[in-house]
């Protein structure tokens, strides 16, 4: 894939709530010129129906070829986006999904690679950090071309929550959630700022915002998925738009800085896991990680989060079905 290619092709694997919402976001924002949607055989007609339904919006947006795809259609795609997986149920953590979704992930990645695909994988199925790692292993692709959605949605939730608390536009809030996309994630308070003004300084001019309120705010961000799942059964709109944003950064070779599941090679004392941190992303995938200088407490949280992910990966890879991939 090159940044000069004019016809941009995306293949979506998984046409559930997240996948179909992502497809709608691509159509609505005019991203890519071709979108193929892959589903399991028993749901193929749903993909056909969604492709038809989405095509009826094109007169209002921009031209795009949309169709129910097969794995061989991945061969010349720029980007394969994986949203397929068992959904998270009420009371279930993202890490509880590992066993079910690793098997699904292996089947998908094996078939995509067999098509001759040589683009970029973008993973959104949960637990996303673990499944980004498994996609890397099962594909044998360079780590730069395997990307997880990471903490992109968590960071957006954090920015929106701070914006509401401080009565400012969320686009003027610059703040990150790092670590696992899940229970061990953490807020990078030390570098949060409003239009370049450090949050601590900004709060000096803001009445009635106490530290306890900020802690509660973060907890609301961390637990947002559970809240939504308990109320409506699933989360999909926020992550769909996050995926569309990542897709645009890749297809347009933006070199945008986004918080993604990025392979760790010693930054923050962490190695051999994919975990959420900011990174520069463009047409060839991850250009480089952006290593925010965390304070000691934040560094410890990053290491603890990575340790949890590593334990899950180590346990999963005891399964003989997945051990062969470790040799890649």
Swiss-Prot record:
Superkingdom field: Bacteria
Residues reported to bind NAD(+): 18, 39, 46, 71, 85-86, 107, 124-126, 149
Protein localization: Cytoplasm
InterPro entries on file: L-lactate/malate_DH, L-lactate_DH, L-lactate_DH_AS, Lactate/malate_DH_C, Lactate/malate_DH_N, Lactate_DH/Glyco_Ohase_4_C, NAD(P)-bd_dom_sf
Pathway(s) served: Fermentation; pyruvate fermentation to lactate; (S)-lactate from pyruvate: step 1/1
Residues engaged in binding beta-D-fructose 1,6-bisphosphate: 159, 174
Binding site for substrate: 88, 94, 126-129, 154-157, 235
SUPFAM superfamilies: LDH C-terminal domain-like, NAD(P)-binding Rossmann-fold domains
GO biological process: glycolytic process; lactate metabolic process
Keyword check for Oxidoreductase: yes
Enzyme class: oxidoreductase
Alphabetized GO MF terms: L-lactate dehydrogenase activity
Catalytic activity line of the entry: (S)-lactate + NAD(+) = pyruvate + NADH + H(+)
Entry EC number(s): 1.1.1.27
Keyword tags: Allosteric enzyme, Cytoplasm, NAD, Oxidoreductase, Phosphoprotein
PROSITE patterns (alphabetical): L_LDH
Purpose: Catalyzes the conversion of lactate to pyruvate.
Description of how the protein assembles with itself and partners: Homotetramer.
Protein family membership: Belongs to the LDH/MDH superfamily. LDH family.
Name recorded for this polypeptide: L-lactate dehydrogenase
Organism listed in the record: Streptococcus gordonii (strain Challis / ATCC 35105 / BCRC 15272 / CH1 / DL1 / V288)
Organism lineage: Bacteria, Bacillati, Bacillota, Bacilli, Lactobacillales
Gene this chain is encoded by: ldh
